[in-house]
């Protein structure tokens, strides 16, 4: 009997340690690059929402408009962190390396990454020179980026200003963050990330409530006009983490 009691205690200890290790693994934090890249994804979805909610003209593929908006919006919202956020998203695009078909609305991922770097560099060439150089942006291409990126930035600043919340206005149209009970959804929804998302969403003077869901789903990030909801799938978070935590 003493032997059996001792054996049970040992087994209980092993199971307790294993459960603790599993819980620690389950709750491990995402890499900063993953959270940075996904913040650009949120900004991109805000761009989609602005186009639809305010009936802005769509003169080129929507994904391109939203990409440019996101880069400028991140720069205006987090000027001290823009380099790390845009660099992380560019690295994620390069890791994806998708080559769309000839008639796709999407550019290839290498081009999308380059566009992010080019556009941010053009907002403040002296500040972002080293970042541009790291990604291979120099010479004539850098000069071209300085020219057209400044114009794109100016255009977006004017549009954003038109739809911005007045400084002293009460925010009423940003809903609570909804988070699925999954490993990657919980890992993304840190207090800091929630604060960043709220800050981005609350900068716009929405006429109806906008919410963000981090959901248990297979897919990427989407904007639903009917539900006025931005959704990020936990499978998308997992993909980013595998690409950017190396």
Where are these regions (language model features)?
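Pan-zinc metallopeptidase signature
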Residues: 103-195
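Zn2+-dependent metallopeptidase catalytic core
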Residues: 186-208, 240
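Second-shell loop/turn segments in exported
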Residues: 28-32, 36-37, 50-62, 102-103, ...
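Sec/Tat signal peptide C-region and signal peptidase I cleavage site
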Residues: 20-24
């Amino acid at each position: 009997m003493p032997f059996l009691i001792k054996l049970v205690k040992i087994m209980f200890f092993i199971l307790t340690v294993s459960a603790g290790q599993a819980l620690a693994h389950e709750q491990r934090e995402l890499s900063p690059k993953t959270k940075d890249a996904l913040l650009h994804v949120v900004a991109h979805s805000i761009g989609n929402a602005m186009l639809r909610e305010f009936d802005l003209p769509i003169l080129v593929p929507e994904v391109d408009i939203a990409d440019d908006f996101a880069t400028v919006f991140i720069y205006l919202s987090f000027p001290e962190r823009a380099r790390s956020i845009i660099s992380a998203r560019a690295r994620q695009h390069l890791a994806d390396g998708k080559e769309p078909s000839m008639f796709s609305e999407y550019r290839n991922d290498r081009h999308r990454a380059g566009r992010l770097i080019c556009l941010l560099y053009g907002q403040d060439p002296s500040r972002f020179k080293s970042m541009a150089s790291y990604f291979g942006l120099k010479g004539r291409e850098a000069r071209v980026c300085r020219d057209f990126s400044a114009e794109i930035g100016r255009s977006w600043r004017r549009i954003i200003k038109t739809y911005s919340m007045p400084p002293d206005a009460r925010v009423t149209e940003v809903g609570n963050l909804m988070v699925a009970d999954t490993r990657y959804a919980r890992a993304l929804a840190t207090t800091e990330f929630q604060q960043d998302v709220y800050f981005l969403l609350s900068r716009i003077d929405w006429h109806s409530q906008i919410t963000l869901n981090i959901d248990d789903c297979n897919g990427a990030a989407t904007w639903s006009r009917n539900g006025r909801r931005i959704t990020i799938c936990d499978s998308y978070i997992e993909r980013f983490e595998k690409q950017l935590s190396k």
